[in-house]
UniProtKB/Swiss-Prot annotation:
The lineage of its organism: Bacteria, Pseudomonadati, Campylobacterota, Epsilonproteobacteria, Campylobacterales. Pfam families: Radical_SAM, RlmN_N. Residues 109-340 form the Radical SAM core domain. It comes from Helicobacter acinonychis (strain Sheeba). S-adenosyl-L-methionine binds at G173, E174, S203, S226, L227, H228, N302. Gene3D superfamilies: 1.10.150.530, Aldolase class I. It is found in: Cytoplasm. Its main location: cytoplasm. Belongs to the radical SAM superfamily. RlmN family. It comes from the Bacteria. The gene is rlmN. This is Dual-specificity RNA methyltransferase RlmN.
Length: 353
């Protein structure tokens, strides 16, 4: 199968296409005008050039096969690879957004949009609380397949070209186990879809030896660590990878992560009833993160079929958060979106068509 044109960075296309300025023109057609056929690019491309593009590349390599709609406005997308028919999911999230008008000081209300993308079909990490791992690991997604998730979702929701998206690598898969394709996708998000790296978050279960490699690339993205426990015994029961990279090992690498002024590393902490949601756990978490510029994002466990875990009460989550905030550690509780369509954290999976 010919490569997808979405797999190429602007620099790579500039080296492949002659004259090289054609690369920028092609990028505009792809990412600013959503063109899905080379024949639709005839305004400034000759028939011969279009024929050469058709000979070298394909465009779309995935398609939307189903969309689930949540009462909160979120949507879960089931994508199918046109190459091997494997499926994977991504989520479109709508959030309320408030801004202050600099001239009038009036509060302006609007919406901000986040796409939670997948980077693998299945996952190798095998977190016990996550539904994705039940299907095992199939393969890595190409950069083009990651990019097309955001493109197709933006197109399906009729969002203006200029409307910025937030991208979070929190769907199916471990981003650091597909680092090359993830980094290429981030570059294309930036130069193609004009998404600032500051709007992109990479969430990892703690592949400690890949964190410095990501840091060296200096992409300017937000780093999020799926911590979920304050001791190695509990964390290993939740995240088997912890047996290889324990909490101390992960935190040592996080301490070296380059941070801009006023930026913090995000630690995601999944609250599970009677396992890691006590005030004593909050105290241990405070001690663990001492000296790290960090913020904690609490996630209430999202139930799924066959899970042995239970969701804690919102009251216990608030007590946990209030304690950390009172001690100066910024802590928020993530609003669970799309629970009614099984699209919340830890609920995505491959589906057989």
């Amino acid at each position: 199968m010919k490569p997808s044109v979405y797999d190429f960075t602007l620099k790579e296309l500039s080296q492949l296409l002659k004259p090289s300025f054609r690369a920028k023109q092609l990028y505009l057609w792809l990412y600013a005008k959503y063109k899905t056929s080379f024949k639709d690019m005839q305004n400034n491309f000759s028939k011969d050039f279009i024929a050469s593009l058709e000979q070298e590349f394909v465009l779309r390599t995935i398609e939307i096969t189903h969309v689930s709609h949540s009462v909160d406005g979120s949507k879960k997308y089931l994508f199918k690879s046109l190459k091997d028919n494997h499926t994977f999911e991504a989520v479109f999230l709508k959030m309320k957004d408030k801004k202050i008008d600099e001239e009038t000081n009036a509060i302006l209300e609007g919406e901000k949009y986040t796409v939670c993308v997948s980077c693998q079909i299945g996952c190798q990490v095998g977190c016990s609380f996550c539904f994705t791992q039940k299907g095992g690991f199939v393969r890595n997604l190409k950069a083009s397949e990651i990019i097309q998730q955001a493109l197709l979702i933006k197109e399906d929701n009729n969002l203006p070209i200029e409307k910025a998206l937030n991208i979070v690598f929190m769907g199916m898969g471990e981003p650091l186990n597909n680092l090359d394709e993830v980094c290429k996708a981030i570059e294309i998000f930036n130069t193609g879809m004009q998404i600032s790296p500051k709007r992109i978050t990479i969430s990892t279960s703690g592949v400690a030896d890949k964190i410095p490699i990501l840091a060296e690339k200096n992409l300017g993205v937000q780093l999020a660590i799926s911590l979920h426990a304050v001791d190695d015994k509990t964390r290993s029961s939740l995240i088997p990878l912890n047996k290889k990279y324990n909490i101390e090992c992960v935190l040592n690498e996080v301490k070296k992560w380059p941070l801009e002024q006023r930026k913090r590393v995000m630690f995601e902490y999944l609250l599970i009833k009677n396992l890691n949601d006590s005030l004593n756990c909050a105290k241990k978490l405070l001690k663990l993160l001492n000296g790290i510029k960090s913020k904690v994002n609490l996630i209430l466990f999202n139930p799924h079929e066959g899970s042995k875990f239970e969701r804690p009460s919102l009251e216990s989550a608030r007590m946990f958060a209030d304690f950390l905030n009172s001690k100066g550690l910024l802590c928020t509780i993530r609003e669970s979106k799309a629970l009614d369509i099984e699209a919340a954290c830890g609920q995505l999976r491959e589906k057989k068509l």
